Curated annotation (Swiss-Prot):
Annotated transmembrane regions: 2-22, 32-52, 61-81
Swiss-Prot/TrEMBL catalytic activity: a plastoquinone + NADH + (n+1) H(+)(in) = a plastoquinol + NAD(+) + n H(+)(out); a plastoquinone + NADPH + (n+1) H(+)(in) = a plastoquinol + NADP(+) + n H(+)(out)
Organism of origin: Nuphar advena
Gene label: ndhE
Family: Belongs to the complex I subunit 4L family.
Entry coiled-coil feature ranges: none
Annotated protein name in UniProt: NAD(P)H-quinone oxidoreductase subunit 4L, chloroplastic
Keyword terms, alphabetized: Chloroplast, Membrane, NAD, NADP, Plastid, Plastoquinone, Quinone, Thylakoid, Translocase, Transmembrane, Transmembrane helix, Transport
GO CC annotation, single: NADH dehydrogenase complex
Keyword presence, Transport: yes
Amino acid sequence: MMLEHVLVLSAYLFSIGIYGLITSRNMVRALMCLELILNAVNMNLVTFSDLFDSRQLKGDVFSIFVIAIAAAEAAIGPAIVSSIYRNRKSTRINQSNLLNK
């Protein structure tokens, strides 16, 4: 694929993720939008790593670390959301002020 196509796709995914993160009122939807943002960043890392120096794998290795962090977030995030739901009976972001009680 050409560089411009990958960058446009990555910018589109990043924009959708930011828009969803800003407008989301549900914690699960916010976590999904955060995953979109991380995937867009990974696409940029791999693309620019291949563009600037295809012999070194620094961008690829860094994107693997980002994928590992995203996997940990995908495992821990729903557990935190289900715990909040059990205590508050809601997954809405504006209703879950945990510093209140």
